[in-house]
């Protein structure tokens, strides 16, 4: 018996095709039903039940908002009690990483604006009251990441500049608000539909924290489309971006990058090379930390 065969909807499905894209630990399947619907099935170990229940409930809450994303259908236990499944509607379209550069720069920018507005809506869900103070929480994360980097045996060029920025800008973490976070918000988790509209996918890394921390993943978008990434920032802030945002974005990007080689070691030489090259590029964006605004950022499309 396959792990999804005891799901109550199984007899309505005419095809089940595994999807191998992305870094998620979930198994993902594209399902076609007898009544010509496309669905996304996610399966993981039953030990993740409470997390998947919470993810499903949050997506149901987000479904009330105005942006394009998968609709939550059902979740439950399958595979003889060994797994938990989540069933969602499927968003038809292309991976934004592959499609963006086929669009005009203006369209890329406009889709970026939409992505920023979507993220602002996502951040409308508040964090639980009992959550740890952000300054304390993130300072621990910085300490842990620097420590892991120093122990990993790999050396990033200009690592002193990265660590120095982190150490000198910890005060930016004071009094930061917290909210629901998508957890991995970048073009790798976005779909461009066949009508050239934007869809958001893969909420499985959701968390709670400073809303601006979400921009730590912007590097994956900026590498492919500076126009999209500029629009993303401007759309989020409705074209009124505070100076402090750029300083904090660099703090969060720096925190990510100092730990990226230690993370990449688990995945082999190819990922290590990606991490090293990406960090080298980011340092150039910021003129070797002489600027806290990346060189690709445009206040508008005329810049």
Regions found by a protein language model. Give the residues of each.
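An alpha-helical support segment within catalytic cores of ATP-dependent transferases
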Residues: 1-11, 113, 121-183, 234, ...
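ATP-binding pocket architecture of kinase catalytic cores
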Residues: 17-133
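Active-site acidic catalytic loop and adjacent metal/ATP-binding pocket
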Residues: 27-32, 164-215
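Generic structural signal for small/hydrophobic residues in well-ordered secondary structure
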Residues: 28, 41, 72, 89, ...
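Conserved strand-to-helix beginnings and helix N-cap segments that scaffold or border functional pockets
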Residues: 52-55, 212, 230
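Glycine-rich, phosphate-binding/catalytic loops in enzymes
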Residues: 59, 104-105, 199, 216-218, ...
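Short, flexible helix/strand-to-coil boundary loops that buttress conserved ligand/catalytic motifs
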Residues: 63, 73, 100, 204, ...
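Helix-rich C-terminal or lid/interface subdomains of diverse kinases
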Residues: 113, 174, 217, 224-303
């Amino acid at each position: 018996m396959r792990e999804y065969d005891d799901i109550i909807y199984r007899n309505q499905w005419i095809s089940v095709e595994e999807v191998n894209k992305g870094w998620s630990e979930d198994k993902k399947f594209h399902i076609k039903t007898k009544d010509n619907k496309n669905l996304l099935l996610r399966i993981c170990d039953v030990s993740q039940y409470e997390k998947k229940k919470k993810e499903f409930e949050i997506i149901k809450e987000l479904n009330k908002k105005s942006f394009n994303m998968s609709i939550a259908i059902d979740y439950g236990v399958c595979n003889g009690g060994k797994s938990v499944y989540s069933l969602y509607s499927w968003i038809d379209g292309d991976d934004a990483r592959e499609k963006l550069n086929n669009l005009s720069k203006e369209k890329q920018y406009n889709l970026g604006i939409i992505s920023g507005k979507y993220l602002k809506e996502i951040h409308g869900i508040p964090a639980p009251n009992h959550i740890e103070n952000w300054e304390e929480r993130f300072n621990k994360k910085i300490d842990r990441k620097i420590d892991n980097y120093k122990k990993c045996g790999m050396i990033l060029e200009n690592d002193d500049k990265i660590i120095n920025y982190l150490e000198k800008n910890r005060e930016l973490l004071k009094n930061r608000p917290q909210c629901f976070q998508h957890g991995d918000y970048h073009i790798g988790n976005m779909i461009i539909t066949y009508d050239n509209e934007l869809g958001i996918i893969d909420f499985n890394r959701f968390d709670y924290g400073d809303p601006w921390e979400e921009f730590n993943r912007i590097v994956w978008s900026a590498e492919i489309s500076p126009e999209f990434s500029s629009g993303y920032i401007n759309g989020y802030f409705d074209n009124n971006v505070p100076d402090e945002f750029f300083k904090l974005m660099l703090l969060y990007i720096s925190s990510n990058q100092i730990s990226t080689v230690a993370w990449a070691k688990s995945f082999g030489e190819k990922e290590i090379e990606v991490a090293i090259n990406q960090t080298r590029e980011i340092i150039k964006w910021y003129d070797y930390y002489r600027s806290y605004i990346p060189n690709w950022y445009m206040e508008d499309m005329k810049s």
